[in-house]
């Protein structure tokens, strides 16, 4: 067996974990399944990450970073809160059908899994960062305080994703995300 640097082994194991997540969901991620997918020795997981939980966290963090970049890239924050919220909902709807990211949204929603709960703040930070960017770009606050608007946006997404995980009906999920987008956009832009 040829030598693989620690950096390369780390990438190999993260990619293998993501592949196992896609194939088998969180329940299918075991030390053996990841090692087999990576074609790496079992001990390499503990040597590189310390534990399977640490490896799963690293893999999910990678997916969250990719989702954050994909959702935020190309949003025209100068257009205002409404168009951006609608854009977020449209992008999330597209992610539900994506093999790489669908697992993150469907299978790794916070459900009491300690590994996932540690990542919840990163997940919610995306909406807050976008709301902050919009505020800077448009020079005014939304009608709903930014932290609350970010939480409401993510709560809508979480609810639709949980329903999608239960019924697997993409048409309903897309429609519900679109409607939540319109409602939140209207509420954010409304001036009292």
Please place each PLM-identified region on the residue numbering.
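Hydrophobic/aromatic residues within well-ordered alpha-helical segments
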Residues: 9, 52, 59, 63, ...
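Amphipathic alpha-helical packing segments from all-alpha helical-bundle domains
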Residues: 68, 73, 98-101, 114-138, ...
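Short helix-capping/turn signature of helix-turn-helix
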Residues: 49, 94, 107-114
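Hydrophobic alpha-helical connector segments
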Residues: 58, 69-101, 149-153
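Short Lys/Arg-rich basic patches
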Residues: 2-3
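Helix-turn-helix
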Residues: 6-12, 16, 20-58
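Solvent-exposed, amphipathic alpha-helical segments
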Residues: 12, 16-24, 70-73, 108, ...
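Amphipathic C-terminal alpha-helical segment
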Residues: 98, 111, 133, 154-172, ...
